[in-house]
Each structure stands twice: as C-alpha cells, then as structure tokens.
Amino acid sequence: MMLNATEFLTPNAINVDTVNETIAKVTLEPLERGFGHTLGNALRRILLSSLPGAAVIEAEIDGVDHEYSTLEGLQEDVLDLLLNLKGLAITLHDQNEVFLTLDKQGPGTITAADITLPHNVDIINPELVLGTLSDRGHLKMRLRVVMGRGYEPANQRREDGDTKAIGRLKLDASFSPVLRVAYQVENARVEQRTDLDRLIIELETNGTIDPEEAIRKAATILQQQISIFVDLEAEEAPEPVKEKEEVDPVLLRPVDDLELTVRSANCLKAENIYYIGDLVQRSETELLKTPNLGKKSLTEIKDVLASKDLELGMRLDNWPPADLRVDDRFSYRSR
C-alpha cells in the first residue's frame, strides 16, 4: 500500500471484544501517528459526559424532613440510603420523567427489586441493596427519576415552589450510563510503516446501554459536532450602510429662484450653472470670466446669495448629491 505524503490512512479494522454485558474492549487500527490520542481522548470525554441516561434526582421519605434525619427501624442513616439510590441503573422508555414508589415492611433487606415500576420503566440492577430494616422498621418513599446528561449537582438545579417543599430530598445526579472509560495507544504496523497507532478503548456501562452502542453513540455525537467544519464558509461582512448626507435644501433649488436679472440668469446658464449649489462653488474670478457678466451682475449675485446666508467660493464636499441625477440637469437646461 503506497500513499503519497498528503494522503491519510483510515482505519480498516475494528475489533469488539465483549467481556460481559457491561464491559467491552474496542480496538481500532491503523491510525496515523498521533490520531490515537486525538480520537481516544475525544471519545473518552464524550462517553463520560455526553451520553443521555436516567437518574434519581429527588426522594420523599415518610417520617424524614431532611437528609440528616434518622428513620426508626432503618439500620442505615438517611444519607447512606440516598447514596445507595444513586447506584440505581434505570431505563425510561419514551418518557423523560417518572415517579416511582417503594413500600417495604421489615425485617429484611431493601433492594431495588422492592421498587414498584410502571410498564415503561426497567431497573437493570434489581439486586442493588438500598438498606436494611429491623423487625419494626417500615420504609415508604417516592422517587423522582428524570433523563439528563453528564453530572448535575443538586444545588445547581432549578427549583420551583413544589421542589422546595420540606421533606423533598434532592440528590446529586450522574446521568451517564458509562461508569468507566480507559484508552491506550499502541504501535501499529502496515507493511513497511511502523509509526502508526492502534487505539484500544475499554469501557464499562451500568447495563442500561450496550458498550458497543455507547461507542457508536459517542462517535455519532463527535461527528455531528465537527461536521459543521466540513462545509465551513466565511460569512461575508455586510457592506456598511452609508448614511445619507444631508444637503441644504436651498442648494437644490434652481438659480431661477434667485430672481436675478435676465442678463445674469442667462450668463449662468451659459456656464452650465443650473442650481444654487453649482453657483456658490464658483469664485468671483471664475464668474468674471463669464462672457457678458460684469461687475454689476456679480454684485447682484453676491447680494442675493448673502440674503440667503450664502456666498461665492463655498466648498461643498457632498455636491452634487447622489440623488441629483445628470438627466435632471439636462431636463432643467431644456426648459
């Protein structure tokens, strides 16, 4: 197998070694040098933090007001009972929240199998020990189970009026169905190349998801998150909106509005001066060079402009305005 310097090897062999229902070892090879750690670390983080799962987030126990209470007939402290509830491996089918009940009379051991389940809820580890009751012991409690991702401390959970009620004990929730993930990178060889990686991922779940399915879901999440880069296109910067510069309305009026003498008006039109804005930009020297326009006409023009707070030789940076089309001038000229 010959590859040029710019081509990448892609894995062509994947082996899944299932130890039991909850533990599996997945081997992927060959990978380019360094890609074993790149993919291994990314998949490990996703497996531990991003797969959805169900967990108990709240418990109500008859006769118990807070987690530091003791319950007569229960050998364990309430804190120990709550800690044991975190070990429940629960599967919810087609729902995001459910309430479960447990009503147990002593003596005897309390296990997850004592929890009453609706038809759409399964407990994968019914043998889990929750506590022990003496002869006169009686435990009755109600559990709130929800779907989530990652780890959610109880003190960061949003509360409403009901969840703040006395007797509702909040639990830190670990929703991840993956209990443990470890990966290692070994050397791999393909023909003459010995600088390749072999990625080995070993993981353990709580039984609510198959280890192979967990890997598949983690890879799908990773693919979805980075797929946006495949079609990455730089957004075109929007063109700045040019603010329309205000022009003195007087400058947009035709020179005829100045009511000059016929002689002066005709001289200006001969020099293609149609608007007052055209006129004020001319200097006295320029106007005196106009045929048939003498000092008397110049004085007349200066006096009329002065009456409108204007003068000759003005500098107008925004003249002519964009909306003053060339054809406007020609139409004016033909009048």
Curated annotation (Swiss-Prot):
<feature type="region of interest" description="Alpha N-terminal domain (alpha-NTD)">
    <location>
        <begin position="1"/>
        <end position="233"/>
    </location>
</feature>
<dbReference type="GO" id="GO:0000428">
    <property type="term" value="C:DNA-directed RNA polymerase complex"/>
</dbReference>
<dbReference type="InterPro" id="IPR011263">
    <property type="entry name" value="DNA-dir_RNA_pol_RpoA/D/Rpb3"/>
</dbReference>
<comment type="function">
    <text>DNA-dependent RNA polymerase catalyzes the transcription of DNA into RNA using the four ribonucleoside triphosphates as substrates.</text>
</comment>
<comment type="similarity">
    <text>Belongs to the RNA polymerase alpha chain family.</text>
</comment>
<dbReference type="InterPro" id="IPR011262">
    <property type="entry name" value="DNA-dir_RNA_pol_insert"/>
</dbReference>
<dbReference type="InterPro" id="IPR011260">
    <property type="entry name" value="RNAP_asu_C"/>
</dbReference>
<keyword id="KW-0548">Nucleotidyltransferase</keyword>
<dbReference type="Pfam" id="PF03118">
    <property type="entry name" value="RNA_pol_A_CTD"/>
</dbReference>
<protein>
    <recommendedName>
        <fullName>DNA-directed RNA polymerase subunit alpha</fullName>
        <ecNumber>2.7.7.6</ecNumber>
    </recommendedName>
</protein>
<keyword id="KW-0240">DNA-directed RNA polymerase</keyword>
<dbReference type="GO" id="GO:0005737">
    <property type="term" value="C:cytoplasm"/>
</dbReference>
<dbReference type="InterPro" id="IPR011773">
    <property type="entry name" value="DNA-dir_RpoA"/>
</dbReference>
<keyword id="KW-0804">Transcription</keyword>
<dbReference type="GO" id="GO:0006351">
    <property type="term" value="P:DNA-templated transcription"/>
</dbReference>
<feature type="region of interest" description="Alpha C-terminal domain (alpha-CTD)">
    <location>
        <begin position="247"/>
        <end position="335"/>
    </location>
</feature>
<dbReference type="Pfam" id="PF01193">
    <property type="entry name" value="RNA_pol_L"/>
</dbReference>
<keyword id="KW-0808">Transferase</keyword>
<dbReference type="GO" id="GO:0003899">
    <property type="term" value="F:DNA-directed RNA polymerase activity"/>
</dbReference>
<dbReference type="InterPro" id="IPR036643">
    <property type="entry name" value="RNApol_insert_sf"/>
</dbReference>
<dbReference type="InterPro" id="IPR036603">
    <property type="entry name" value="RBP11-like"/>
</dbReference>
<dbReference type="Pfam" id="PF01000">
    <property type="entry name" value="RNA_pol_A_bac"/>
</dbReference>
<dbReference type="GO" id="GO:0046983">
    <property type="term" value="F:protein dimerization activity"/>
</dbReference>
<comment type="subunit">
    <text>Homodimer. The RNAP catalytic core consists of 2 alpha, 1 beta, 1 beta' and 1 omega subunit. When a sigma factor is associated with the core the holoenzyme is formed, which can initiate transcription.</text>
</comment>
<dbReference type="GO" id="GO:0003677">
    <property type="term" value="F:DNA binding"/>
</dbReference>
